[in-house]
Amino acid sequence: MHNMYTREQYLALCKDIEEDDYRYYVLHDPIISDYDYDMKMQKLLSIEAQHPEWRVLWSPSMRLGDRISGSFPVVTHSHPMLSIANAYTLEELNDFFSRVEKTLGYTPTYTLELKIDGIAVAIRYEQRVLVQALSRGNGRQGEDITTNIRTIRSLPLRLPKEAPEFLEVRGEVFFTRATFEQINSIQRQSEKPEFANPRNAAGGTLKLLSAKEAAQRNLELSIYGAWAEENTESHYDNLMLCQKWGFPVFGRPRQYKSVEEVVKALHEIAKIRDQLPMEIDGVVIKVDNTEDQKVLGMTAKHYRWALAYKYAPEQGETILEDILIQVGRTGVLTPVAKLRPVFLSGSKVSRASLYNEEEIERKDIRIGDTVYVEKGGEIIPKVVGVCLEKRPEGTKPWVMPEYCPVCHERVSRESDKVSVRCTNSSCSAGTIEKIRFFVGREALDIEHLGEKVITKLFDLGLIHRRCDIFQITEEDLLQVPGFKDKSIKNVLKSIEKAKSAPLERFIAALGIPYVGIGGANALAQHFLSLDAVMSASLEELKVIDGIGSKVAESIVDYFHQSDNVEEIQKMLSLGVNVLPYSRASASCQGKTFVITGSLEKMTRSEAEASIRNCGGKVGSSVSKSINYLVVGKDPGSKLKKAQELQIPILNESDLLKILYPN
């Protein structure tokens, strides 16, 4: 009986499991079987259930995770988490060395660490027990992510007696390549969107409201700095002490006595970069002596004693075997490169983006060419150039097909001469894409209805258009291979939930050409109801901020098509309740945003209009007075300036969460 245990025996069991965790997750040298470990953990949980008052903050059960309240409080950092300046060339590197040596008057010892591509965190210990963990945030304040950080098995929840009573460590939270592949495999099996890269996956995991789910993903941590009342005068020695106290240090810190040694090490690390278990995007160079660091000091933006040397995105060379055509939900034909498989960043690449016909013409890409492929943090790599010296004889310029590869109807060319579209409303490819988009995360967000399920239901003749989703029955789902009682109940529950749709989400889900989520929100805020949107005139639409003539014409055209109106009416008759827009949201009130780069889910004007509609302002240049920089693809110099000024950086997904918190 567990009620026979004393508190001393409970604490001894905690310490025993703590040692097992250290041997397994840090030393990778377990001395007990998984079964024996599980039995110990079950015993611990049982004792804590009998005596909840005994549970200590460093109990191994804290790693299993509880549900988080629903928000992450913002807390001020004890020391600012400044950024590190970047260098991409040897010239920039030498400038850094010259500045350091000119200030100090001699060549210092440098410590090099792998720049792991992850999420920076600060973790605080009091009385040698982990009490708080914060994200980097804007460098001055971060979000309290303690509950999810505790799920990292390699991180000690309690420190040994030789460690300082009060200690703060800084580190990078990340996923190994292998774990990242496992996570995306699970995402694919669940028909959920894959993560673009390990860094995005780590960031998303730290923000999960279920720490139990976070624990299942196996986050890793690598410490790169420590603050205590009595630090040694060597940064390298401090890291070695952290390692001795049980902290994981995966950055492979090494000391070098000369600039020549540092440069040689950078070249050597570049050679083994792809063989490392985790993604790195460079190497951090630090002046090792902490007194020298104080002399060098810092700017408002970054430390003067550290520099991040960034490697260029990895490129591969392979053969372009074919150019395939994908048909999207609006009928747009998109060319995709079929490649002879090539390994990039540790994974096999056989498909790459070609964007559109104009891009293919500009780069003169032909089938049979030897092409350069680059993987720069996206799921789908891109073809960046052609090796003309290796072009085979007889190749011909590629031209967009005149007929849809799916329904074989003639395609039409848009007035912008870039988009080529299949206008056949019955085309199966476009129909499936429309349905998939309709139920997707950025639209009605109907869980458990992924692309494979949609395609199977379509192939079985159970759905033909979007409104059919709301008529799916248990008998229909039983015909889908692999579906069981629990899965069927989950799908039907999600469909029922989606019947109460906020106006802006419903409009976005319709997939009106040129109307993204930003435009949908602008329409909802202006007209407040679905009826008003559907009956709006061209003149009424044109006056809305963010809705230009082209978008207005597309909206009017969409609601003048009888098929579209009939389908919406059918949805309403099936119980769909489109909720009127509420003006209560002012999520951007008093905030100033600047946007750089191209956005994917909405146009620049839609994003700006949405920010203004939520009470925010949109600036044109980066300065200390702005609150956020929103970064899309191919950002300009604004990104570098914002990083120097420590202005919070948002990607498009971050912006959408602010604009549409529900």
UniProtKB/Swiss-Prot annotation:
It catalyses: NAD(+) + (deoxyribonucleotide)n-3'-hydroxyl + 5'-phospho-(deoxyribonucleotide)m = (deoxyribonucleotide)n+m + AMP + beta-nicotinamide D-nucleotide. Its EC number is 6.5.1.2. NAD(+) binds at D34, Y35, D36, Y37, D38, S83, I84, E113, R136, E172, K286, K310. Its cofactor is Mg(2+); Mn(2+). InterPro entries: BRCT_dom, BRCT_dom_sf, DisA/LigA_HHH, DNA_ligase, DNA_ligase_AS, DNA_ligase_CS, DNAligase_adenylation, DNAligase_N. Zn(2+) binds at C404, C407, C422, C427. The active site is at K115 (n6-amp-lysine intermediate). It is an enzyme of class 6 (ligase). Residues 583-662 form the BRCT domain. It comes from the Bacteria. It holds the Pfam family HHH_2. SUPFAM superfamilies: BRCT domain, DNA ligase/mRNA capping enzyme, catalytic domain, Nucleic acid-binding proteins, RuvA domain 2-like. The keyword Metal-binding applies. The keyword Disulfide bond does not apply. GO terms for molecular function: DNA binding; DNA ligase (NAD+) activity; metal ion binding. Keywords: DNA damage, DNA repair, DNA replication, Ligase, Magnesium, Manganese, Metal-binding, NAD, Zinc. One of its GO terms (biological process) is DNA repair. GO terms for cellular component: cytosol. Transmembrane segments: none annotated. DNA ligase that catalyzes the formation of phosphodiester linkages between 5'-phosphoryl and 3'-hydroxyl groups in double-stranded DNA using NAD as a coenzyme and as the energy source for the reaction. It is essential for DNA replication and repair of damaged DNA. Belongs to the NAD-dependent DNA ligase family. LigA subfamily. This is DNA ligase. It comes from Chlamydia felis (strain Fe/C-56). The lineage of its organism: Bacteria, Pseudomonadati, Chlamydiota, Chlamydiia, Chlamydiales. The gene is ligA.
